[in-house]
């Protein structure tokens, strides 16, 4: 957070808009700067690597942990499919992980409800679980096309991520979308620090397989989709 504040302090007063061109990290930095300077933010993603392009939050690291800062959403998002389509295959559609984590998110959410570990605000809601499960099912269906850079599949991915973000915003929490796979991702990051952090999907993917296995799920379809 302190580094982001330093960047914000260095923004000249005559700047009227912040443009972010790149992946999820670039988007987060742009949103944070726009929020601190109270100016519009325009993001042009070069990959569909995560759902952060569409959220009102920024994931900022401080003291070895990740904190979420509510900055508000971007003012405008410009998607050029020719740019997305030609991105490196390993990150081009990596945002599909945001839909696959629904699998463990829902399993953890139901488990917590069965053991009276939810709050009034995060109580299990079958209607929401049903909708989110449908989004995850669609992710498995489009995965092959996303991996091949098929524009229609990438459009589907973008729409599904938007719906996922919209529903979690409506619920006011991420229980149906994120699960215990996140614990693995953050633990790995702490145990094996790197000068350049691993992409989000690369950290969460193994955790997703572990969490699903702990719930007794067949991880074959998930492994194939991640591949």
Identify the function of each model-found stretch.
Residues 30, 51, 86, 187-188:
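Generic hydrophobic alpha-helical membrane-span motif
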Residues 9, 32-35, 186, 190:
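Short, well-ordered alpha-helices that flank and scaffold nucleotide-derived cofactor binding pockets
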Residues 35-135:
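A glycine/threonine-rich phosphate-anchoring loop and its flanking beta-alpha core
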Residues 124-226:
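Active-site segments that bind and position negatively charged phosphate/pyrophosphate groups
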Residues 1-4, 223-227:
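Short, intrinsically disordered, charge-balanced linker/junction segments flanking boundaries
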Residues 13-33, 37-46:
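A short, small-residue-rich loop immediately preceding and capping a beta-strand
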Residues 1-17:
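ATP/NTP phosphate-donor binding region
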